């Protein structure tokens, strides 16, 4: 009786349900993610301890605007008086939007790029991880004690280091047990660092944002110790249930899925696919589908032209029909075959792809959802 006259959207209704559930359960920490934009989003009713804004890209433009500054202004709407804010990778006019909003709200703002001057972030393959583990084991056996980290010359930022290489070894073992690649995070003041389970290239930027946010939370009184950093970064998928972020589902051939669904997301995916093709000498087989309301042409222009494509559609009404997508892709110089379902497309890719090569599945969160829902059918474990 209360909700029906308001005609809430699905997201608005489930947000209200989540808030009620969190209150009833008296959760220690609630992480609330904006649905779209920020200023007018239903989640913006709360006053949090910390606001985090990730990188700004072109998405939902029919609602948020057709320039990055307009989109940034909508996202800046979550910045509140005296609530610190962390902002991910941004530049130029977009950075000024957030700086001016933070000044108007009398709050402290941190841009994660400020960490780059004293932080080294690197993608590590599975073999690289084995080498890092061997080096750490040598440190441990020689009982080298690492220096205590000094306060860094940056407001509210005291970077986190491990005290004992054993923590890093345990973190690497957790990742290697899952046959995964990783992101390593090192600071110039210490010899060993953090190992991040999410290994997509975009995570090299995201992990800086996470570190900045965690450091501010520590300053606000949250109890976060060094061991928590190692456990959290190396075990994030199991602890959160997060799926579809450059997630490996099979070896021989490698099969990776990713939920990137716009041009901004595919810029990182393109770099990773280029590395796989040119450096690892693996031929690419790409299962691809999108929803109709995205800027499909911009994404198609970013896809490698020397790959074999399996065009398909997800099991949602918004999905672009596979034959229409294949026609658009053909005009962009991409060659392949269309399949009515994700299962059909992935099955064809697995049959055609030699063990030494590589299968990528993506283009839409719904494509990845269909894939993950059919892991047993496709024998992906």
Predicted feature descriptions by range:
Residues 1-46, 62-64, 70, 92-93:
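ATP-dependent carboxylate-amine ligase catalytic core
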Residues 22-28, 276-281, 349-357:
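Glycine-rich phosphate-binding loop signature in dinucleotide/nucleotide-binding domains
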Residues 29-32, 42-44, 48-52, 56-60, ...:
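Nucleotide phosphate-binding/pyrophosphate-handling subdomain across enzymes
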Residues 36, 288-290, 362-365:
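Glycine-rich beta-strand-to-loop/alpha-helix junction loops that act as flexible
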Residues 38-40, 47-105:
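Conserved catalytic-core segment of NTP-binding enzymes
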Residues 88-89, 103-135, 139, 166, ...:
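Beta-strand->loop->alpha-helix junctions that form or flank phosphate-binding loops
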Residues 91-97, 101, 109, 166, ...:
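C-terminal helical cap/extension that packs against the catalytic core
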Residues 364-381:
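Glycine/aspartate-rich loop-and-adjacent alpha/beta segment that forms the canonical ThDP
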């Amino acid at each position: 009786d209360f909700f029906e006259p308001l005609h809430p959207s699905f997201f608005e209704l489930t947000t209200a349900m989540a808030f009620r559930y969190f209150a009833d359960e008296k959760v220690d920490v609630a992480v609330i993610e904006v649905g779209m934009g920020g200023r007018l989003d239903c989640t913006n009713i709360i006053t949090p301890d910390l606001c985090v804004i990730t990188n700004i890209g072109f998405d939902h433009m029919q609602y948020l605007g057709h320039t990055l500054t307009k989109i940034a202004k909508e996202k800046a709407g979550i910045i509140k008086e005296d609530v610190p804010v962390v902002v991910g990778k941004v530049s130029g006019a977009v950075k000024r939007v957030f700086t001016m909003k933070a000044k108007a709200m009398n709050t402290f703002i941190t841009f994660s790029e400020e960490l780059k001057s004293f932080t080294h972030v690197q993608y590590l393959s599975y073999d690289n991880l084995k080498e890092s583990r061997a080096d750490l084991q040598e440190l441990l056996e020689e009982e080298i004690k690492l220096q205590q980290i000094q306060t860094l010359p940056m407001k509210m930022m005291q970077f986190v280091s491990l005290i004992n290489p054993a923590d890093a070894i345990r973190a690497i073992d957790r990742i290697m047990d899952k046959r995964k690649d990783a992101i390593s995070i090192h600071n110039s003041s210490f010899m060993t660092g953090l190992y991040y389970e999410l290994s997509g290239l975009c995570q090299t930027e995201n992990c800086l944002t996470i570190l900045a946010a965690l450091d501010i939370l520590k300053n606000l009184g949250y109890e976060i110790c060094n061991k928590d950093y190692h456990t959290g970064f190396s075990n994030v998928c199991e602890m959160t249930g997060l799926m579809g972020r450059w997630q490996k589902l099979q070896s021989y051939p490698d099969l990776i899925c990713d939920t990137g669904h716009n041009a901004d997301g595919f810029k990182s995916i393109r770099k990773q696919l280029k590395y796989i093709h040119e450096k690892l000498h693996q031929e690419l087989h790409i299962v691809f589908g999108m929803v109709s309301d995205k800027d499909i042409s911009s994404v198609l222009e970013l896809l490698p032209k020397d790959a074999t494509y399996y065009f398909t559609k997800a099991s949602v009404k918004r999905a672009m029909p596979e034959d229409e997508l294949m026609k658009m892709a053909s005009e962009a110089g991409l060659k392949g075959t269309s399949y009515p379902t994700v299962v059909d497309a992935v099955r064809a890719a697995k049959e055609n792809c030699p063990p030494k090569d590589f299968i990528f599945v993506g283009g839409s969160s719904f494509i990845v959802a269909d894939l993950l829902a059919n892991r047993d059918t496709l024998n992906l474990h």
